[in-house]
């Protein structure tokens, strides 16, 4: 029998690399492995990574455009809201002013009515006063005549 490890031990001269027929075979195996890994593994992984990168980029672009649109809409709604508030305040102010005008007109009418009633009552009181004075004058005249008659009759 041939002792193979012994034969191999004699052939190996030592050193890091042996430049013999196995070196080109190892290089060919390495290059074949690189081509296979590139074809089977690296290209699909690179493709998936590129697709993912493109998806992220388009999603970010879409999200940023949506954010810009949302900001524009928010600004527009804020502007519309402030305009609506301003219009509401103007309507409230005009309604209050109109209500104050109506109330002041009603107060003026009521004052005029009250003044008319007071003037009418004053006239009626003056008329009644005059009538009472005339009645009193007549009664005074009658009483003075009666007193004269009594005085004259008691003197005679």
From Swiss-Prot:
Keywords annotated in UniProt: ATP synthesis, ATP-binding, CF(0), Chloroplast, Hydrogen ion transport, Ion transport, Membrane, Nucleotide-binding, Plastid, Thylakoid, Transmembrane, Transmembrane helix, Transport
Residue intervals passing through the bilayer: 20-42
Subcellular location, principal: plastid
Annotated GO CC locations: chloroplast thylakoid membrane; proton-transporting ATP synthase complex
GO terms assigned for molecular function: ATP binding; proton-transporting ATP synthase activity, rotational mechanism; proton-transporting ATPase activity, rotational mechanism
InterPro entries the record matches: ATP_synth_b, ATP_synth_b/b'su_bac/chlpt, ATP_synthase_B_chain
Coiled coil ranges: none
Subcellular location: Plastid, Chloroplast thylakoid membrane
Membrane-topology annotation of the record: Single-pass membrane protein
Pfam families registered for this protein in UniProt: ATP-synt_B
Subunit: F-type ATPases have 2 components, F(1) - the catalytic core - and F(0) - the membrane proton channel. F(1) has five subunits: alpha(3), beta(3), gamma(1), delta(1), epsilon(1). F(0) has four main subunits: a(1), b(1), b'(1) and c(10-14). The alpha and beta chains form an alternating ring which encloses part of the gamma chain. F(1) is attached to F(0) by a central stalk formed by the gamma and epsilon chains, while a peripheral stalk is formed by the delta, b and b' chains.
NCBIfam families membership: PRK07353.1
Family the UniProt entry places it in: Belongs to the ATPase B chain family.
Protein task: F(1)F(0) ATP synthase produces ATP from ADP in the presence of a proton or sodium gradient. F-type ATPases consist of two structural domains, F(1) containing the extramembraneous catalytic core and F(0) containing the membrane proton channel, linked together by a central stalk and a peripheral stalk. During catalysis, ATP synthesis in the catalytic domain of F(1) is coupled via a rotary mechanism of the central stalk subunits to proton translocation.
Additional free-text comment from the UniProt record: In plastids the F-type ATPase is also known as CF(1)CF(0).
Name of the protein this chain belongs to: ATP synthase subunit b', chloroplastic
Species name: Pyropia yezoensis (Susabi-nori)
